[in-house]
């Protein structure tokens, strides 16, 4: 998307505090062997994460020149209220962190990987190129990923649990579509009550000794345009009349196309990516905006 190649990212400065609310234990990993000899992937091994989440309270922000889509039109509100399915990005949307950046920092390569993430989310490099480059910088082993999941429970964005609960109460299906890793998203889905079959994400691959081998390139979310294909696949399979995509990055915006999402809502409560926000149907900084509009 050429219009996004010069996207500027404005980090949203938010204080963070841990919450003491507890969630039911859930499994997050499982070893799965692939037909290719020596290839192993982790999926749902019964390893417990401490059920602790974190929340942020965003400061009031200036509109930064996006007044036109901060207040939604009647047409946009009607679309939102008529959706039958909502697809969420995960990193910097459902969760306050970029998962791959956090894993890289845990493995000692945080700064270099974060720079690649900014380029990928702004749309200045193909997503598959950025994904491969980032993983090559730290090559996480199976044991390191397991350790990370044990020590770093998901940190959810404020209001996301309430929004998902509201959507589900209104019989609206919820999906997670992410360029991140399924191993790190499964726990998030468990907290939110989202079925595993409603997750579209990448998968890390490991050898028999737990060494890093790469990622599954057959996943649509492993390449540019993949989120759009995932949304189109969902729509075709479930015959939804109206769908929305909520996220912060260029790959989320791409999901709004014929046969895909009818509505793109840019969530800028963590990162404001200006070119993405400017092209959104609706720009929000808090999920409460969406919750209240459903009443």
From Swiss-Prot:
Keywords: Amino-acid biosynthesis, Chloroplast, Hydrolase, Magnesium, Metal-binding, Plastid, Serine biosynthesis, Transit peptide. Residues 1-54 form a transit peptide. One of its GO terms (biological process) is embryo development ending in seed dormancy. It holds the Pfam family Hydrolase. Mg(2+) binds at residues 89, 91, 248. Ubiquitous. Mainly expressed in shoot and root meristems, vasculature, pollen, anthers, carpels and seeds. Belongs to the HAD-like hydrolase superfamily. SerB family. Catalyzes the last step in the plastidial phosphorylated pathway of serine biosynthesis (PPSB). The reaction mechanism proceeds via the formation of a phosphoryl-enzyme intermediates. Required for embryo, pollen and root development. May be required preferentially for serine biosynthesis in non-photosynthetic tissues. This is Phosphoserine phosphatase, chloroplastic. It comes from Arabidopsis thaliana (Mouse-ear cress). The gene is PSP.
């Amino acid at each position: 998307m050429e219009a996004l190649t010069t996207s500027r990212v404005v980090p949203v400065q938010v204080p963070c505090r841990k919450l003491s609310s507890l969630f039911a234990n859930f499994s997050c990993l499982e070893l799965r062997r692939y037909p290719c000899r020596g290839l192993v992937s982790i999926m749902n091994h019964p390893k417990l994460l401490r059920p602790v989440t974190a929340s942020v309270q965003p400061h009031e922000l200036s509109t930064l020149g996006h007044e036109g889509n901060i207040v939604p039109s009647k047409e946009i509100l009607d679309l939102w209220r008529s959706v039958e399915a909502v697809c969420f990005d995960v990193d910097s949307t459902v969760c306050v962190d970029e998962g791959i950046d956090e894993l890289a920092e845990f493995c000692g390569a945080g700064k270099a990987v974060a720079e690649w993430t900014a380029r990928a989310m702004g749309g200045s490099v193909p997503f598959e190129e950025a994904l491969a480059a980032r993983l090559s910088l730290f090559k996480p082993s199976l044991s390191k990923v397991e350790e990370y999941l044990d020590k770093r429970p998901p940190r959810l964005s404020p209001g996301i649990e309430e929004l998902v609960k509201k959507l589900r109460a209104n019989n609206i299906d919820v999906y997670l579509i992410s360029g991140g890793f399924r191993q790190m998203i499964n726990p998030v889905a468990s907290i939110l009550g989202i079925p595993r079959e409603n997750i579209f994400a990448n998968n890390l691959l490991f050898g028999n000794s737990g060494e890093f081998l790469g990622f599954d390139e057959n996943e649509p979310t492993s390449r540019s345009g993949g989120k759009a294909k995932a949304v189109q696949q969902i729509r075709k399979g479930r015959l939804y009349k109206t769908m929305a995509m909520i996220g912060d990055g260029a790959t989320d915006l791409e999901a709004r196309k014929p046969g895909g999402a009818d509505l793109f809502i840019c969530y800028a409560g963590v990162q404001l990516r200006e070119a993405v926000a400017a092209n959104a149907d609706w720009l929000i900084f808090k999920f409460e905006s969406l919750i209240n509009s459903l009443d």
